[in-house]
Design a protein with these regions (language model features):
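N-terminal flexible segment immediately upstream of the FAD-binding catalytic core
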Residues: 1-72, 76, 86-118, 147, ...
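Mobile "lid/hinge" segments at catalytic clefts and subdomain interfaces of large enzymes
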Residues: 157-159, 163-250, 254-326, 330, ...
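Ferredoxin-type iron-sulfur electron-transfer modules in oxidoreductases and energy-metabolism complexes
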Residues: 548-581, 585-723, 841-847, 885, ...
Length: 1018
């Protein structure tokens, strides 16, 4: 039995008083003080971990102003505040103690657009890709690019002055910020924009906080103009935080306070809104993917690409390429980056040309390709091949792979993981190759592996050395390397922070700015935040206050993780290896990962949040001397003793009375998971939440009773076959209003599905496919076996959507094969989802033995529901290991593709069909939609893939009363719009859950693709 974890780091009373008074004064946002909420805000995409005291989620600038006014009260003068948005920072920029002010949950509105003048006004929580999706119909985009664009917010980009691919042409975020609305500590609203110097000087004479700010910045930047110009490096990625260089224009006629706030990392004010310059979308985009025999060759050849007038040159090393090959993303780009025969591709330059003149762009591309061919023939520059990508869809897929590179590095095998701490250094591009050669020599001298990729045109390369932060010696080495890289970048006239901001690296600021200029930064900080209450420890302390700075060797996630025994860390790898990349925060409703995060906007309900909580839970167990691996081994095979039952009843009673246990917070996070498994493939690190969720639930319920609904779900495969013998009787009973009311109130289940009428057995009575014995199958000759297909049943389709199975059997017959319906054998997936892992292992072993026996017959086995079929491949393998055997159950599309391989493609005509894939299917098997389309094409039918996210049903998730609202909300995110837009009778869904959700919400259902094929053939 797991122990009660009764104590978690508490919240000081002053913070609680502040939050209470905040709500009393009309704060309309959310506040959170639970340990789980604070833990999810204690990390970002960096190696650091710092626990805040509380989190607030304002809904408007007025809410932020209320926070700032109340904070200025003397009784709360000791509290500190840190703005936060996407949480994708790689250097702890938004990590701090005190109160976190999170803009991402509610402040995500696009307020206004002016296409004629080319600008847009947004709130700080708007995500970069969200904005570009909105701008696309107007023919615009927000130009600064970054790899985390589908979850990084504009507020975060502004606060770190972010930039990435294309910055040589488009510049940094600050180059596109026309003005901001910022809330100062005290509640004053500061609106910035470029001003004539005379007006700025006049504003500085006002005896107000804003007047003091204008006066300080104006006077310091004017008086120290020459010092600033002399000390700021002449780089595309100029020195940020605070950008003293660009406050005045070159002619000294214009003053813009915006440039001080961009890159300020929340140390000066709360930026709540911004007016942004937007750029016309280029009409033509081309990529030339240039392949090299070494990474050094790729680096040294980059200036040649820039000279060819390319928009950007991105580079990727062999380590990143090889990790991409192992990821789901490679499926989408493999044809665009093919291997060169008899050559090893160890480096890649992705060269983009863009513009409005197609003839001119193609001329430049062709000229480059001619030069590349000359280099290949003469064996110069290490060029071994190239490919041109002319289609926009292909261009976007290549960049999606490149964007995923940073996350893929975290999936490197072993305890040492490539980590960010010196990953955005910038040097003049002409020195980049030599600089990287020395950088690599430094890492090689310590025997470290590393991955490299980046923006070689701008002189920025992302270098992530592999270190084990659970090893104290490697943590020391990380600081040593960091110091060495500071010296190395200075040697080449570069910067340590080229695009990701400073964060915990601000301790190096004096070395880059110089003491005299650093003192000027402190004066600016003092004008905005004299008492050091906004994100203290970052950028610089205010003048006149001897405050410490955050350090590179501050407390890290590894500091906590190393308290967990190595064996436990290894066995719970799925939770331990989350590196915080945050891809699970992807805003796009059509992305399968992560539906619970999308609907709640609560990061507790994301793979990263769940992994964070489980890691802390494991640490707290270790702190109490409890070994979860031993507990798992000691679990009884079946049943529990009366003594244990009494103890669980008592513990559950106390829990219902409000007794605290951190395990309850973890349980709450796990209960929101749909177990769709999208994270297990979509996450670059392959964080498999359903797997460690099941293990947690199994251990949690050693202490607490399981709800009745869990037992009902776990035993569905036992009672469904019995109920299917009299489906009308049971449906009548289930349909009674009283039964449904009792089910919702006392069991916690709603909208219970009805059994199929007639049942599958009734439909197939007397049919040869349902009456073949094992002996009859074994007696078939080789030719007969080659034409026989064994259909594997699953509990949901066979008993609740039997027509699909019956139609598949008929389809198999129509295609000239003999279908055989195998006896039903429980799959066990429902047991796995609810954490009945011992019971699941028994079920899996029994069914695996049966299917292995069938496999020996040498006939293909096929199942129709993707989630259940894929369970045989994934969960069975984890539960049984080698005992699983070698059997293989094919999906319907896999078998059809093979069976129809020799059939020619017919002329496609008629109305299109529309394919809606199951989350588990399309993430585990990304080629499934195309495979289905190819199958339809063989019969002259067109099948279009519809890009949607999760439907919200996910097995029994949508039938649980506590999930009902979220289930319907998830459906509304993407499925409902698609169903309203398309003809229902032409929509097809492979998942039983998906079809049942459509029927529940829309009133009429959709069919399985095999049913449409049967109709087409008829």
């Amino acid at each position: 039995m797991i122990p009660q974890i009764s104590q978690a780091p508490g919240v000081v009373q002053l913070v609680l008083n502040f939050l209470q008074e905040l709500e009393q004064q009309g704060f309309t946002g959310d506040t959170a003080t639970s340990y789980a909420d604070r833990l999810t805000m204690s990390t970002d995409n960096s190696i650091y971990q710092l626990l805040p005291d509380a989190v607030v989620f304002p809904r408007s600038t007025a809410d932020v102003a209320l926070i700032a006014r109340l904070a200025a009260q003397e009784r709360y003068s000791s509290l500190i505040f840190t703005p936060r948005s996407g949480g994708t920072g790689t250097n702890g920029q938004a990590l701090n103690q005190g109160i976190i002010v999170d803009m991402s949950r509610h402040m995500n509105r696009i307020i206004e657009i002016n296409p004629e003048e080319g600008w847009v006004r947004v709130e700080a929580g708007v995500i970069k890709d969200q904005l570009n999706q909105y701008l696309k119909p107007f023919g615009y985009f927000f130009a600064p690019e970054l790899s985390t664009s589908n979850r990084a917010t504009l507020g975060g980009m502004i606060n770190t002055d972010a930039s990435g691919q294309g910055s040589l042409v488009y510049g940094k975020t600050s180059d596109h910020v026309l003005g901001v609305r910022a809330v100062l500590l005290g509640g004053d609203i500061l609106d910035t924009q470029p001003l004539p110097v005379e007006l700025a000087e006049t504003l500085g004479k006002s005896n107000t906080t804003i007047g003091r700010i204008y006066n300080t910045v104006y006077q310091r930047c004017r008086q120290q103009r020459q010092l600033i110009i002399d000390n700021f490096p002449k780089l595309n990625r100029f020195l940020t935080g605070y950008d003293l260089r660009h406050v005045f224009n070159d002619e000294m006629t214009e003053f813009d306070l915006t440039r001080i706030l961009t890159g300020s990392e929340g140390t000066l004010a709360f930026i709540t809104e911004a007016r942004l310059d937007i750029t016309r979308l280029p009409k033509v985009r081309r990529l030339v993917n240039v392949k090299y025999d070494s990474f050094d060759s790729a680096l040294r050849n980059a200036p040649f690409m820039v000279e060819a007038r390319a928009l950007s040159v991105e580079t990727v090393d062999s380590k990143v390429l090889n990790l991409a090959r192992e990821d789901i993303v490679w499926h989408s780009v493999s044809e665009l980056i093919t291997d060169v025969p008899d050559k090893e591709m160890l480096g890649l330059n992705i060269v983009e040309f863009a513009g409005d003149d197609e003839a001119l762009i193609d001329e430049r591309v062709n000229a480059l390709c001619v030069r590349l061919d000359e280099l290949i023939v003469s064996q110069q520059a290490g060029v071994i091949g190239w490919q041109v990508c002319r289609e926009l869809a292909g261009v976007e897929r290549i960049y999606a792979m490149r964007k995923k590179a940073v996350g893929l590095l975290g999936n490197a095998k072993g305890a040492a993981k490539p980590i960010p701490f010196a990953e955005d250094t910038c040097v003049p591009p002409e020195h980049l190759a030599d600089y990287i050669a020395e950088f690599r020599a430094l890492l090689d001298s310590h025997g470290l592996s590393y991955g490299m990729f980046g923006h070689v045109d701008a002189g920025v390369l992302h270098v992530r050395p592999a270190l084990d932060m659970c090893d104290p010696q490697q943590e020391i080495l990380m600081k040593q390397i960091s110091d060495d890289v500071v010296a190395l970048t200075a040697k080449y006239g570069g910067l340590l922070w080229g695009e990701h901001g400073k964060g915990f690296r601000a301790e190096y600021s004096p070395a880059f700015f110089g003491e005299e200029l650093f003192a000027e930064l402190r004066k600016v900080k003092a004008a905005f935040d004299p008492h050091n209450r906004l994100n203290p420890g970052k950028i610089c302390p205010p003048e006149g206050l001897d405050a410490p700075m955050m350090k590179v060797d501050a407390v890290k996630r590894g500091t906590f993780d190393r308290q967990i025994p190595i064996a436990v860390r290894q066995q719970w790898r799925g939770a331990m290896e989350c590196n915080g990349n945050g891809l699970c925060f992807n805003f796009d409703a059509r992305s399968p990962m992560c539906p619970s995060m999308k609907i709640t906007q609560n990061r507790i309900h994301s793979p990263k949040g769940r992994a964070t909580l489980v890691r802390e839970w494991l640490r707290l167990l270790a702190d109490r001397g409890v070994d979860p691996l031993k507990l798992e081994q000691e679990l009884p095979e079946s049943g529990v003793s009366l003594r244990t039952l009494i103890a669980r009843t008592r513990n559950s009673w106390h829990a219902n009375k409000g007794e605290y246990d951190f395990s309850h917070e973890v349980k709450e996070a796990m209960s929101g998971c749909l177990a769709c498994k999208a994270c297990s493939t979509q996450c670059p690190i392959k964080i498999d939440v359903p797997e460690f969720r099941s293990r947690f639930l199994q251990l949690y319920h050693t202490r607490y009773l399981r709800p009745l609904r869990d037992h009902l779900v776990a035993t569905v495969e036992s009672y469904a076959p019995l109920m299917a013998r009299a489906p009308k009787t049971f449906n009548f009973f289930i349909n009674q209003p009283l039964v449904r009311k009792l089910s919702e109130k006392h069991i916690g289940m709603v909208d219970l599905p009805l059994l199929s009428v007639p049942s599958l057995q009734q439909q197939m009575a007397g049919h040869r496919s349902a009456n073949m014995t094992l002996e009859q199958l074994e007696s078939l000759n080789a030719e007969q076996k080659a034409r026989t297909v064994l259909v594997v049943q699953d509990p949901f389709t066979s008993y609740y959507d039997a027509q699909v199975v019956a139609d598949f059997l008929r389809l198999v017959e129509k295609l000239g094969f003999q279908p055989v319906l195998l006896p039903f054998s429980p799959n066990g997936k429902a047991q796995h989802i609810k954490g009945f892992l011992n019971r699941f292992a028994k079920t899996a072993k029994k069914t695996a033995d049966f299917l292995n026996r069938m496999a020996k017959l040498g006939m293909p086995m096929v199942g129709v529901d993707p989630a259940l079929v894929l369970c045989y491949r994934d969960e069975y393998k984890l539960a049984l290991g080698e005992e699983r055997g070698e059997f293989n159950v094919l999906l319907a599309n896999e078998w059809l593709a093979s069976a129809l391989e020799s059939q020619p493609v017919a002329t496609v005509s008629g109305e299109s069909w529309y394919f809606f894939g199951h989350c588990t299917e399309v993430t585990a098997l990304p080629g499934a939609p195309a495979q289905w389309a190819a199958i339809f094409a063989r019969f002259g039918a067109k099948l279009e893939n519809v890009s949607v996210g999760c439907c919200g049903m996910a097995g029994t998730y949508g039938h649980e009363a506590k999930n009902h609202k979220n289930s319907l909300g998830i459906y509304e995110l993407s499925w409902h719009q698609a169903m309203q837009r398309l003809p229902r009778n032409r929509c097809l869904a492979t998942g039983y859950s998906c079809r049942s959700q459509v029927k529940r919400v829309e009133g009429t259902g959709v069919r399985h693709p095999v049913q449409a094929l049967l109709e087409i053939i008829k």
